[in-house]
Amino acid sequence: MLGGGWRSLGTALVALGAGALLRAGPAQLRAVFLHTEHEQRKSKTVAQANMKVEVLPALTDNYMYLLIDEETKEAAIVDPVQPQKVLDAVKKHGVKLTSVLTTHHHWDHAGGNEKLVKLETGLRVYGGDSRVGALTQKVSHLTSLKVGSLNVKCLCTPCHTSGHICYYVTKPNSSEPPAVFTGDTLFVAGCGKFFEGTPEEMYRALIEILGSLDPETRVYCGHEYTINNLKFARHVEPNNVSIQEKLAWAKAKYDSGEPTIPSTIAEEFTYNPFMRVREKTVQEHAGETDPIRTMGAIRKEKDNFRVPKD
């Protein structure tokens, strides 16, 4: 057991890269080690006629996403913390990787950028923060990018970090659902911690920006936090049937090693307490009548929430 663990640890450290390793703190190294215990997590392909998304588990509970334009076979990678795994997926799909879409600068999202650009030269690296490694173009709110024939709109959603970007992907003249890559702003049934922002900023990010997207938009978030998020959601709204049903579904998926990603914007409004801060049931739980104050109250509660085992 120990020997296998050390071998896996060595593999993990090689995957992370020496530069990122030197910058990593104890918590980061722990996550690199723990990801070896989660290697049974399965990848998943979400295929549409115009775009394909390969869901790539990384580290302990992270997700990377290979976005493929089916028309041109051009691809972008979202948050490539494990570069070799990314390149293996690129080879598997027979596509040309042209760009990196970085949601934010945290090491478990941007920590693989510098190694990836050395392994695959000529990549364009996008992000909304100068702290993003190997950055070639800093983007801002509503900056437009292209991945083959796909349109990518940058949505500035500061709060988790001040330079956080979500990437909204559409295909012109298509009736298929768009996709949005939300990093650590919006999770399934949750949201990111307010490390560099305020409840007002998260309200704007979730309700006014992401919440105004096409309801059928598929949400690809940065972490597999779904079960714990839904347990907190159940605590906030114990009589919400949508939460109960989603939790049972998520447990079954997790037990089989499958991702619970993607959700949709419409679904998030039914079970995500941070998307439901205008609902009376959530406000009553928080003891507030204002949605922004409710956002702050339930985030503070979530930060100290002890997740039940059931």
From Swiss-Prot:
Looking at its record, which EC class is this enzyme? Answer: hydrolase
> Which GO annotations describe the biological process of this protein?
glutathione metabolic process; L-ascorbic acid biosynthetic process; methylglyoxal catabolic process to D-lactate via S-lactoyl-glutathione
Q: Where is the signal peptide?
A: none
Q: Which domain of life is it from?
A: Eukaryota
Chain sites annotated for binding Zn(2+) 1: H104, H106, H160, D184
Q: Specify whether Cytoplasm is a keyword of the entry.
A: yes
Q: Where does substrate bind?
A: K193, F194, F195, H223, E224, Y225, R299, K300, E301, K302
Gene Ontology molecular function, alphabetical: hydroxyacylglutathione hydrolase activity; metal ion binding
Q: How is the cofactor bound?
A: Binds 2 Zn(2+) ions per subunit.
Q: Which GO terms describe its cellular component?
A: mitochondrial matrix; mitochondrion
Necessary cofactors: Zn(2+)
* EC number of the protein: 3.1.2.6
Catalytic activity field: an S-(2-hydroxyacyl)glutathione + H2O = a 2-hydroxy carboxylate + glutathione + H(+); (R)-S-lactoylglutathione + H2O = (R)-lactate + glutathione + H(+)
User: Mind listing the UniProt keywords for this protein, alphabetically?
Assistant: Cytoplasm, Hydrolase, Metal-binding, Mitochondrion, Transit peptide, Zinc
State whether it acts alone or in a complex, and with which partners, per the record: Monomer.
Please give the family membership noted in the entry: Belongs to the metallo-beta-lactamase superfamily. Glyoxalase II family.
Role, per record:
Thiolesterase that catalyzes the hydrolysis of S-D-lactoyl-glutathione to form glutathione and D-lactic acid.
The protein here is known as Hydroxyacylglutathione hydrolase, mitochondrial
Could you tell me which species this protein originates from? Gallus gallus (Chicken)
Species classification = Eukaryota, Metazoa, Chordata, Craniata, Vertebrata
